Amino acid sequence: MYHGDWLQRRKVHPSRREIHGIPIAQSEAVIERTIRIAAVADLHYRTGTDGRFRTAFTEISDCADILLLCGDIIDYGLPDEARLLMKDISETAKRITIIAVLGNHEYESGKVDEVIAIMKGGGITILDGEACEAQGVGFAGVKGFPGGFGARVLAPWGEPSIKRFVHEAVEESLKLESALARLRTTSRIALLHYAPIAATVMGEPLEIFPFLGCSRLEEPINRYPVAAVFHGHAHNGTHEGKTSSGIPVYNVALKLLEKTFPGKPPCRIIEVPSGPEQRAETAQAQAGR
């Protein structure tokens, strides 16, 4: 399901189950649900933009079960910007699950811990190498990092500063792999800020491609049965692409969504099946073993 009739359709759709071709009555079967996931990135909340998305957040909560925020949610990484966001999104956070990853802008002012605390205090789940589950769907999230794509991905060669840069990209990839490995759900969703493939940054100047994402992030996505990937960062990129194994990737940068779907709500909505919920291993549980 995409944008067309999004307000008219119901959120949850029980389906009839069969075993060996024999229908099972709903009272005797595990009822599967379709979960609607909305995603957007690069809101860049700052002084003067408060109130801009309040109506949109309300509309999203009317038609989606879960909202993903894929980084650069605020502009300069200031706590006051986070408070403006929470003022607009607080009612939505009471109605539906909101899951987020940070982007590069959240780090600009060196107050990222305070920003995270404000967002978490307002009911937003922040993922940074962790896994979580909501309504039977699994989510793995990291910020990601630059580094380039394909055969031109930056290698750890030469100056120590280059090696540290590549190490950061590798670490983000390993964090994503660890998070995906913890999930035991029918559907898995990966949310990032930086792009895992080149296809969804097409449209940006070629000179900045290495700073828009890194194909090292694609490796763990291909290794696990991921239903979809969402990212942002490339405001002038391409909305949709696929990994080398065919997994759909959506660039949900706000500016790109507004250009791709003019007059529509500022989000991309997909539907995924929800299986019986099984708890994901948390980072704390892993550390305690």
Regions found by a protein language model. Give the residues of each.
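N-terminal active-site segment of His-dependent metallophosphoesterases
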Residues: 2-97, 106-110, 162, 166, ...
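Binuclear metal-dependent phosphoesterase catalytic core
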Residues: 6-9, 24-26, 31-34, 117, ...
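Active-site neighborhood of phospho(di)ester-bond hydrolases with catalytic His/Asp-centered motifs
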Residues: 39-41, 67-72, 99-104, 125-129, ...
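Conserved catalytic scaffold of divalent metal-dependent phosphoesterases
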Residues: 43-45, 113-209, 253-254, 272
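Metal-dependent catalytic neighborhoods of phosphoester/phosphodiester hydrolases
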Residues: 49-52, 71-90, 102-122, 150, ...
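A general structural detector for well-ordered alpha-helical segments in enzyme core domains, enriched
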Residues: 56, 60, 84-89, 115, ...
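Cap/insert and terminal regions of metallo-dependent hydrolase folds
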Residues: 79, 84-89, 195-224
